[in-house]
């Protein structure tokens, strides 16, 4: 009787989880009834993914807050730049010059080194039509690859998973952070979120604390019952297949087991693999260090997602911005050094983005306000290094409401990465054709 009550309690928990979920789930057939069977299957999938022809890895790095692209890739050859920014303009003799017109912020010494090595492409003037200056909405546009007037339920990475990753390992996408980005939202949820190897979270959770509780609950649900059998074995295999095949219970049980396997694997890899480079002690440095460990440990992930905050520089920008960019450059350089020492550098491409740039003119508080277009950085030994696209004009007559006009649609960058790096068609993911750029 006690066992029946326990089972009923467990079933009720799972039903409530389904009813309160905000996601639409497509329920697959239950394929594994025990932890060991799933683990073997996961290892088989991992081998197929990591040894296949599409074993490239993408790392998406969000520069959250709205990076000032004009003080990142600096048009030091433009008089308009210095006239518009009397308080925060970077002196020409401090700029890390790429040519006689543009150069990098002095905080980006590591990026200049990557550029000189042929491992950095700079896509200039990236944005989209009818730009939105809201942090929330513009981030949503970038993460869902939508038009500024349209609202998409699923993220561009999630749509990639839906279109190209049927049957993939649960760790096909890994976010390093406390909350899953909307970019991962998918019809069939895939991917995991972790802010450190001991603090694993489900992609389905709205917040980190709930995610930890869900993991603990799922672990308890899949422990041995007092009767000596696991939940999936209580009714016997044939009865389970006949009565529960394709049910929501099946999917949740599979989700729990998948999560248990992947979380244990992430923890094990993190403990086993040693870093081969010295990283900054920042949040970004630690995030990229973990990503490098997971790559070195053979986790079958196609897309990693990391974030660096602090770019909403409305006041006293110069020092803060330079420190952020130094952290960015040094963290990414350490990451590339680590991957090179592992022998994995050829497999990895890193791409940065920020939800918008900043206004051309500085403000009275020695900062900048929300703007529009900004550059993107693409890092890796297989990039076509150099400057891509056209730097937007800073001439007052060429501005739109005080902002530079975009010259490259960000979805063209996504299309380039999807087609040339992840080897999949971009139209089903982006909704229509965007002309790829010669990035890789």
What does each model-found stretch correspond to?
Residues 345:
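Conserved H-loop
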Residues 364-366, 371:
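Histidine/acidic-residue-rich catalytic or RNA/ligand-binding cores of hydrolases
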Residues 348-356:
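Acidic/histidine-rich, metal-coordinating catalytic segments
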Residues 2-342, 361, 375-440:
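Feature for exported/extracytoplasmic and membrane-associated proteins, marking the mature portion
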């Amino acid at each position: 009787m006690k066992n029946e009550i326990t089972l009923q309690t467990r079933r009720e928990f799972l039903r409530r989880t389904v009813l309160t979920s905000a996601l639409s789930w497509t329920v697959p057939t239950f394929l594994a009834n025990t932890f060991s069977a799933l683990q073997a299957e996961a290892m088989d999938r991992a081998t197929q993914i990591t040894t296949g022809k599409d074993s490239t890895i993408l790392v998406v790095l969000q520069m959250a807050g709205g990076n000032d692209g004009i003080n990142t890739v600096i048009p030091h050859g433009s008089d308009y730049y210095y006239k518009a920014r009397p308080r925060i303009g970077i002196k020409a003799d401090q700029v890390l010059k790429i040519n006689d017109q543009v150069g990098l912020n002095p905080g980006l010494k590591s990026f200049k080194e990557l550029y000189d090595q042929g491992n950095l492409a700079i896509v200039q003037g990236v944005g989209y039509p009818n730009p939105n200056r809201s942090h929330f909405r513009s981030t949503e546009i970038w993460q869902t690859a939508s038009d500024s007037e349209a609202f998409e339920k699923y993220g561009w990475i999630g749509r990639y998973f839906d279109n190209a990753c049927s049957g993939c390992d649960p760790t096909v996408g890994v976010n390093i952070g406390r909350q899953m980005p909307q970019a991962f939202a998918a019809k069939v949820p895939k991917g995991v979120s972790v802010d450190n190897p001991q603090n694993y979270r489900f992609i389905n959770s709205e917040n980190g604390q709930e995610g930890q509780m869900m993991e603990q609950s799922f672990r308890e649900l899949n422990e041995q019952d007092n009767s000596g059998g696991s939940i999936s074995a209580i009714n016997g295999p044939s009865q389970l297949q006949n009565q529960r095949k394709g049910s929501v219970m099946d999917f949740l049980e599979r989700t729990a087991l998948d999560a248990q396997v992947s979380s244990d694997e992430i923890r094990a890899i993190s403990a086993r693999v040693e870093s081969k480079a010295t990283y900054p002690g920042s949040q970004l440095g630690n995030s990229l260090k973990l990503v490098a460990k997971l790559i070195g440990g053979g986790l079958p992930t196609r897309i990693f997602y990391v974030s660096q905050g602090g770019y909403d520089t409305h006041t006293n920008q110069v020092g803060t911005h330079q420190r952020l960019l130094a952290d960015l450059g040094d963290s990414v350089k350490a990451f590339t050094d680590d991957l090179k020492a592992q022998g994995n550098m050829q497999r990895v491409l890193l791409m940065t983005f920020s939800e918008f740039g900043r206004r051309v003119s500085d403000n009275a508080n020695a900062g900048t306000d929300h703007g529009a277009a900004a550059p993107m950085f693409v890092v890796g030994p297989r990039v076509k290094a150099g400057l891509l696209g056209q730097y937007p004009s800073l001439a007052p007559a060429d501005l739109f409401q005080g902002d530079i006009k975009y010259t490259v649609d960000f979805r063209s960058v996504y299309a380039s990465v999807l087609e040339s790096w992840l080897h999949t068609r971009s139209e089903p993911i982006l909704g229509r054709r965007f002309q790829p750029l010669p990035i890789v």
